[in-house]
């Protein structure tokens, strides 16, 4: 790699923070929202780090290796989107990102602008490549677990469903994101 190549690579690396990592062995939002969510499992669903497998998802998560979720086994969500939902609803309190059931919550990245892109996230253990495939649409449970009106307010702000393309580990804390340099579109920090 030449000095020019290194400068170009550094220019495309976006500094972000991974604020939350969630891997749950089962879905807690089943049945009718009015009945409330199932209780959390004995083991914590929130993790300091998660292990990913190419094409399969997060080890230990409910969508890991499920054929129906190929291409959508990992959800990526921006903390700023949840803050925008709170403002739209006129709430004077922060919303709990873990209630959204998104796997990876970041700060400093416009996640919803990444559709159709390939990205890498490196939190210190080497880059993990993802294909960002489609929106992670909210469900009616959001009205129950976040706040009334959250289901509608999250439309277009629900994050993205991704497929890991490489094995790797993600950790809480600082990270860098690189957007596929072959793609001419430009993604800006949130």
What are these regions (language model features)?
Residues 140-142, 182-190:
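Short, Lys/Arg- and Gly-enriched loop/turn segments at beta-strand edges
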Residues 106, 159-168:
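Short alpha-helix capping/helix-loop boundary micro-motifs
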Residues 124, 135, 175, 181-182:
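Short, surface-exposed secondary-structure boundary micro-motifs
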Residues 1-125, 129, 134, 187-190:
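Electropositive, beta-rich accessory/interaction domains or terminal extensions
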């Amino acid at each position: 790699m030449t000095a020019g190549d290194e400068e170009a690579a550094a220019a495309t690396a976006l500094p972000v923070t991974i604020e939350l990592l969630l891997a749950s062995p089962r879905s807690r939002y089943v049945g009718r929202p009015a009945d409330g969510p199932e209780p959390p499992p004995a083991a914590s669903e929130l993790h300091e780090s998660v292990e990913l497998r190419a094409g399969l998802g997060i080890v230990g998560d409910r969508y890991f290796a499920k054929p129906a979720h190929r291409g959508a086994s990992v959800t990526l969500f921006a903390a700023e989107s949840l803050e925008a939902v709170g403002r739209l609803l006129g709430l004077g309190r922060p919303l709990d990102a873990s209630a959204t059931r998104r796997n990876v919550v970041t700060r400093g990245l416009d996640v919803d602008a990444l559709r159709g892109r390939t990205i890498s996230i490196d939190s210190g253990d080497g880059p993990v490549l993802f294909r960002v495939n489609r929106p992670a649409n909210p469900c009616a449970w959001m009205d129950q677990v976040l706040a009334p009106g959250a289901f509608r307010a999250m439309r277009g702000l629900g994050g993205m469903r991704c497929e890991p393309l490489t094995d790797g580990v993600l950790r809480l804390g600082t990270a860098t994101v690189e957007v596929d340099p072959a793609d001419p579109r430009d993604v800006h920090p949130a």
